[in-house]
């Protein structure tokens, strides 16, 4: 019975470790929620007999005469020009050294130590040293360029626009997703209804994909199993 219990315990342990190695680590998307917004219907206009209708909804379908048409309401669109170029480097080093030395002796050896040292003079010397050197460095560089048209999904109290958008590109058996969200100041929108991504606050840019190309970049279950077991 004890042998069977030990055998069962060993098999159960290996099974748990195997499931741990097969565990998939999900990635949290940067842009969460809906990636589009629908215009909110305005109030029904009431005709007052004048050429200019003061109650006319200027939010949708309104073209100003003396200014460019710019997004200002939920459902309006604008184009984000992606111009991200980020590079960073870091290096560090540390050195530590410590040396110690101790000498002592005695002319008369205690009786309980005569078997070890004899009756002669005894000298004891101890020395030690410890040295540590450490260096580390890291470099990162990322470049992202392109365009993406987004939709205004929220108008903030101060007039800024919260935008969100997504572009999906299917190539053969894989699909690429480009998602974007952020806060745009209407003053930074150009006459061509574009704004660079470097002028968007709280920008979230995500470029992911699925398919066999993306799966080839993931570590296999057997590799994850041995990686979890390895002490290195």
Swiss-Prot record:
One of its GO terms (cellular component) is bacterial-type flagellum basal body, distal rod, L ring. Keywords: Bacterial flagellum, Cell outer membrane, Lipoprotein, Membrane, Palmitate, Signal. GO terms for molecular function: cytoskeletal motor activity. A lipid is attached at residue 22 (N-palmitoyl cysteine). Residues 1-21 form the signal peptide. It is found in: Cell outer membrane; Bacterial flagellum basal body. InterPro entries: Flag_Lring. It comes from the Bacteria. A lipid is attached at residue 22 (S-diacylglycerol cysteine). It is a lipid-anchor. One of its GO terms (biological process) is bacterial-type flagellum-dependent cell motility. Pfam families: FlgH. The basal body constitutes a major portion of the flagellar organelle and consists of four rings (L,P,S, and M) mounted on a central rod. Assembles around the rod to form the L-ring and probably protects the motor/basal body from shearing forces during rotation. Belongs to the FlgH family. This is Flagellar L-ring protein.
């Amino acid at each position: 019975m004890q042998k069977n219990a030990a055998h069962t315990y060993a098999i159960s342990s290996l099974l748990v470790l195997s499931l741990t190695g097969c565990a998939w680590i999900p990635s949290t998307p940067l842009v969460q929620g809906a990636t589009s917004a629908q215009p909110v219907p305005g109030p029904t206009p009431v005709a007052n007999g004048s050429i200019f209708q003061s109650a006319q909804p200027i939010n949708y379908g309104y073209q100003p005469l003396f200014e460019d048409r710019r997004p200002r309401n939920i459902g309006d669109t604008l184009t984000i020009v992606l111009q991200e170029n980020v590079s960073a480097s870091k290096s560090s080093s540390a050195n530590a050294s410590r040396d110690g030395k101790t000498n002592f002796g005695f002319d008369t050896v205690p009786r309980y130590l005569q078997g070890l040292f004899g009756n002669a003079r005894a000298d004891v010397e101890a020395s030690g040293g410890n040295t540590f050197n450490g260096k580390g460095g890291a470099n990162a560089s990322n470049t992202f360029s392109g365009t993406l048209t987004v939709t205004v999904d929220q108008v903030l109290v101060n007039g800024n626009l919260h935008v969100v958008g997504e572009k999906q590109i299917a190539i053969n058996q894989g699909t690429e997703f480009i998602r974007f969200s952020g806060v745009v100041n209407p003053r930074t929108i150009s006459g061509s209804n574009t704004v660079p991504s470097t002028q968007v606050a709280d920008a979230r840019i995500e470029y992911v994909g699925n398919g066999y190309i993306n799966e080839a970049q993931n570590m296999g279950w057997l590799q994850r199993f041995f990686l979890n077991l390895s002490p290195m």
